[in-house]
């Protein structure tokens, strides 16, 4: 089994489902959002709404895409990865406008301790409106219901305070600061670690 994470790497999947007829990236509806599988036809919106924006990628590990064709190639790989029942990657679509405004996914798994790492990205036009928290809450609830995961964790650049605020809003607990733990478009950075455990 393999999956493509939000940063474009294909990795081994790692955890079991809990007796569901359907698995993987299922469609999730929230008050304002549709969380769904992404397809190659989404490449223009992904490119325009976040993948080409340096303001979005400042704290991320990948550089802004230079053209929509490269985004299409990435999404083609992602479509292949959906064949795995253990690939979790949602596009975040605004219900009212049907705009694709971001993405959220499981980016790493640690099967031996039943832990997953989650990541998310949102276009700047939709920042500070509660969309990330709404999507994150829905995905975390889904993962705890659908899989045997016991711990979901997230890391963010210590300078990216907004990401920490989202995690706290969604019930994650701050566990500490890891010095020079990560590398992103700002260079080598300190990272904050948050987690949420199964109730």
Language-model features: where?
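A short helix-loop-beta-strand connector motif used in the catalytic cores of GNAT acetyltransferases and
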Residues: 77-91
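Conserved GNAT-fold acetyl-CoA-binding loop/helix
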Residues: 57-77
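Acyl-donor (CoA/ACP) binding surface of acyl/acetyltransferases
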Residues: 2-45, 49-54, 89, 93-199
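Hydrophobic residues in alpha-helical segments
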Residues: 50-51, 60, 82-83
């Amino acid at each position: 089994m393999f999956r493509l994470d939000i940063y474009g790497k294909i990795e081994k999947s790692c955890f079991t489902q809990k007796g569901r007829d359907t698995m993987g990236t299922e469609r999730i509806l929230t008050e304002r959002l549709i969380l769904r599988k992404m397809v190659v036809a989404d490449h223009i919106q992904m490119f325009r709404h976040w993948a080409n924006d340096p303001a979005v990628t400042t704290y991320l590990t990948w550089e802004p895409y230079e053209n929509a064709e490269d985004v299409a190639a990435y999404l083609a790989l992602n479509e292949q990865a959906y064949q795995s029942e253990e690939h979790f990657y949602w596009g975040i679509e605004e219900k009212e406008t049907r705009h694709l405004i971001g993405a959220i996914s499981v980016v790493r798994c640690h099967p031996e301790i039943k832990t997953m790492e989650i990541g998310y990205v949102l276009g700047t036009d939709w920042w500070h409106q509660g969309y990330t928290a709404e999507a994150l809450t829905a995905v975390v609830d889904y993962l705890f219901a659908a899989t045997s995961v016991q711990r979901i964790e997230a890391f963010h650049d210590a300078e990216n305070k907004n990401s920490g605020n989202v995690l706290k809003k969604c019930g994650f607990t701050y566990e500490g600061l890891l010095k020079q733990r990560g590398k992103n478009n700002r260079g080598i950075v300190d990272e904050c670690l948050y987690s949420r455990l199964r109730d």
